[in-house]
Amino acid sequence: MRVSKYLLSTQKETPADAEVISHQLMLRAGMIRRNASGLYSWLPTGLRVLRKIEAIVREEMNKAGSVEILMPMVQPADLWVETGRFEKFGPELLRFQDRHNRDFVLGPTHEEVITDIVRKEVNSYKQLPLNLFQIQTKFRDEVRPRFGVMRSREFLMKDAYSFHLDQETMDETYESMFQAYSNILTRLGLAFRPVIADTGSIGGSMSHEFHVLANSGEDLIAYSTGSDYAANIEKAESPMPTQTRGEATQEMSLVDTPNAKTIAELVEQHGVAIEKTVKTLIVKGSSEEAPLVALVIRGDHDLNEVKAEKIPAVHAPFEFADEADIRKAVGAGPGSIGPVGLEIPVYIDHGVSVMSDFAAGANQDNKHLFGINWERNLPQAEAFDLRNIIEGEASPCGQGTIALLRGIEVGHIFQLGKNYSEAMNANVLDQNGKAQTLLMGCYGVGVSRMVAAAIEQNHDDRGIIWPDAIAPFRVGILPMNMHKSHRVQDMAEQLYKDLSDAGIEVLFDDRKERAGVMFADMELIGLPHVVVIGDRNIDAGVFEYKNRRTGEKQEVPFDQIVEFLKSAQ
């Protein structure tokens, strides 16, 4: 491809509204352009990368025995009503009506549609197991789209769905999808980690996420230093306390704390150890009888909202109560709330259950209680795992300790069980002629998100550093002063032809542009290999080669350049 015939829309300046490096570089490299909040057009450079990732995903799905189909982005709302997700999914589900006042949704996922297809097309055990996939645009009306294509409202996704009559074939397909995802990320040239995960709004039992490792990742991954255990922090089980509750040594006392609105301020101003404090958080309950619920964790711990949501009394989706409701129920505002005397249900973390002589809000503004003890000052509350695991704690697998790293989720696989098939009456006849409800699996890859994740992991201060497999072009040709030197022009044209004939994707910068601009653009868009041609190179009979990732430069004889670039890493 000649740059003169190409849309190379690079920018020198970093856009002010781009928060993360992938968003900045995708805009600067001319890969995408914003049309509206969370909506982007893919320009040629970005689309070439997107299509390469899509091709690798498709190849690995085909190898794993999945069969490609294509489902509509617009879905009948009736299917979502069947599964109960029309209301449960929340405002991320874009609902609308057609001219006949029929309800539709813009698909954020396709469980309902695929289950509807299978219940109509599959009626015998002889047609199972069945694994179907598509690569299709999705839409989720994110409350705050951000980070470019990392969290956009419209995105490209590969979603696969498998159907089974028995757990054995379900497990086999799940394992094949796990391996396919590992193969995809390996072929893309990305460092990644599969982790045990929560099933979220899709539901189901077993679940794994696939994370591209990057310091900018939104997700925290907890992994064992002594085994292959790894889990999303939302799912990682915190260790049970090993100590027993100590004896009470203090009387409970009410203390004025006018300047202590946070745990940190309470610790600093009143000399209490943070391990002897608790945070009491008021959240929405799941019933009319208990519209508010109190959750209590140790002052140095962080609430895990995913774990908390699994308590039956807690509203799903998880939501904190607003201050007006808190004051009406408790008589005080956030920062002064504690478990003593609360008239709403109280649930505590396991770590809180073994605390003694601890401090908490007094349910009066600007006051705290010190020297609180269970069963003396308040009844023992029901305990759950409500917190995030902490680096250095014992791993849930029993081997090693926990370390934390950041990742970007690009894939998620689930064993859904019968969640959707039961709701939609998806049954087939087994070998005995008896109707059986189908088991389902679900397997998603964020194709467009992978582009951003790859950049987050592969860049420097000059631009993107693409892995070879997904680079928009493998080689860039930079002819110096081509428009003033016929020798350089002829040599560049011949090299362009030779590389193209050899099946190597080339971007030939034939612009009448300064060398500095040409070099900057090639580094910005991240081509793995660059060949420089100048009069001095021609005199010496060599091309100047530069490797984008290593910065290595070397001279390559004219007659060796094609084979050299074929094997260059």
From Swiss-Prot:
<comment type="function">
    <text>Catalyzes the attachment of proline to tRNA(Pro) in a two-step reaction: proline is first activated by ATP to form Pro-AMP and then transferred to the acceptor end of tRNA(Pro). As ProRS can inadvertently accommodate and process non-cognate amino acids such as alanine and cysteine, to avoid such errors it has two additional distinct editing activities against alanine. One activity is designated as 'pretransfer' editing and involves the tRNA(Pro)-independent hydrolysis of activated Ala-AMP.</text>
</comment>
<dbReference type="InterPro" id="IPR006195">
    <property type="entry name" value="aa-tRNA-synth_II"/>
</dbReference>
<dbReference type="Pfam" id="PF00587">
    <property type="entry name" value="tRNA-synt_2b"/>
</dbReference>
<dbReference type="InterPro" id="IPR044140">
    <property type="entry name" value="ProRS_anticodon_short"/>
</dbReference>
<dbReference type="InterPro" id="IPR050062">
    <property type="entry name" value="Pro-tRNA_synthetase"/>
</dbReference>
<dbReference type="InterPro" id="IPR002316">
    <property type="entry name" value="Pro-tRNA-ligase_IIa"/>
</dbReference>
<dbReference type="InterPro" id="IPR045864">
    <property type="entry name" value="aa-tRNA-synth_II/BPL/LPL"/>
</dbReference>
<keyword id="KW-0067">ATP-binding</keyword>
<dbReference type="InterPro" id="IPR007214">
    <property type="entry name" value="YbaK/aa-tRNA-synth-assoc-dom"/>
</dbReference>
<dbReference type="GO" id="GO:0002161">
    <property type="term" value="F:aminoacyl-tRNA deacylase activity"/>
</dbReference>
<dbReference type="GO" id="GO:0004827">
    <property type="term" value="F:proline-tRNA ligase activity"/>
</dbReference>
<comment type="similarity">
    <text>Belongs to the class-II aminoacyl-tRNA synthetase family. ProS type 1 subfamily.</text>
</comment>
<dbReference type="InterPro" id="IPR004500">
    <property type="entry name" value="Pro-tRNA-synth_IIa_bac-type"/>
</dbReference>
<keyword id="KW-0030">Aminoacyl-tRNA synthetase</keyword>
<keyword id="KW-0963">Cytoplasm</keyword>
<dbReference type="GO" id="GO:0005829">
    <property type="term" value="C:cytosol"/>
</dbReference>
<dbReference type="InterPro" id="IPR036754">
    <property type="entry name" value="YbaK/aa-tRNA-synt-asso_dom_sf"/>
</dbReference>
<dbReference type="InterPro" id="IPR033730">
    <property type="entry name" value="ProRS_core_prok"/>
</dbReference>
<dbReference type="Pfam" id="PF03129">
    <property type="entry name" value="HGTP_anticodon"/>
</dbReference>
<keyword id="KW-0648">Protein biosynthesis</keyword>
<dbReference type="InterPro" id="IPR002314">
    <property type="entry name" value="aa-tRNA-synt_IIb"/>
</dbReference>
<dbReference type="GO" id="GO:0006433">
    <property type="term" value="P:prolyl-tRNA aminoacylation"/>
</dbReference>
<dbReference type="InterPro" id="IPR036621">
    <property type="entry name" value="Anticodon-bd_dom_sf"/>
</dbReference>
<dbReference type="GO" id="GO:0005524">
    <property type="term" value="F:ATP binding"/>
</dbReference>
<comment type="subunit">
    <text>Homodimer.</text>
</comment>
<dbReference type="InterPro" id="IPR004154">
    <property type="entry name" value="Anticodon-bd"/>
</dbReference>
<keyword id="KW-0436">Ligase</keyword>
<keyword id="KW-0547">Nucleotide-binding</keyword>
<protein>
    <recommendedName>
        <fullName>Proline--tRNA ligase</fullName>
        <ecNumber>6.1.1.15</ecNumber>
    </recommendedName>
</protein>
<dbReference type="Pfam" id="PF04073">
    <property type="entry name" value="tRNA_edit"/>
</dbReference>
<dbReference type="InterPro" id="IPR023717">
    <property type="entry name" value="Pro-tRNA-Synthase_IIa_type1"/>
</dbReference>
